[in-house]
Swiss-Prot record:
Listed name of the protein: Geranylgeranylglyceryl phosphate synthase
Gene Ontology BP, a term: glycerophospholipid biosynthetic process
Entry-linked Gene3D superfamilies: FMN-linked oxidoreductases
This protein's GO CC annotations: cytoplasm
Keywords: Cytoplasm, Lipid biosynthesis, Lipid metabolism, Magnesium, Metal-binding, Phospholipid biosynthesis, Phospholipid metabolism, Transferase
Organism field: Pyrobaculum calidifontis (strain DSM 21063 / JCM 11548 / VA1)
Biological pathway: Membrane lipid metabolism; glycerophospholipid metabolism
A Pfam family per the record: PcrB
Amino acid sequence: MKLVDYLLEGSVKHFTLIDPDKSVDYLKIVRYALDAGTDGILVGGSLGIRETQMTQVVKDIKSVAHVPVVLFPGSPSQLTEEADGVLFLSVLNSLDPYFIIGAQVQGAVLIAKHFPRLEVISTAYVIVGDGGAAGFVSMSKPIPYARWDLAVAYALAAYYIGFGAVYLEAGSGAPQPVPPEMVRAVRKVFPRVLIVGGGIRSGEAARQLARERPNVIVTGTLAEEQPEKLAEVVRAIKSSL
């Protein structure tokens, strides 16, 4: 099954984000996530990981994981064909063209020449609220939590341009997640893959988001700091259906 079909199929899925630059013992976190019932692993997010390191990290994870392992690259240097796919990110609300199209031009050439078997999902990355490190590094102008209408406008633009996915990102360690009302509004206008992440620290927060029917809910900081709570989050997502 193609990765995009897996993401679209069935109920809301939970993915665990592994940042190998932050997580020395990333396999321990992966095992916690697998035991909790996670549906997939995202790998990336850092600026300090090279291709050779990423290749080894993905190999290590795939040696223990029975779920898809997908790249979430912080730069074009974080590509490897060992993964099952890549979220080919364009930060739509960045103020720097590099993060909208510059890095993507570099990454596209690398994929075409060196990683042609890697499944690519074009992803409109939209920074919301606090934005966290992702918003700072990408020089974004985050969408305020209360302005769901702006999120809808970006989602519509992503749809008409032809993106295969929209990722609403509140940022690593954000004080609160993307509001459920914003997810609901975007879901109504974007029928493709919808991903939500950032600031999700409890089962109840995950349950409220899952009720709005995104395709994927991502937790990263929680996995790093309190991996024992992953089971609570996954149960909440599954029980919301």
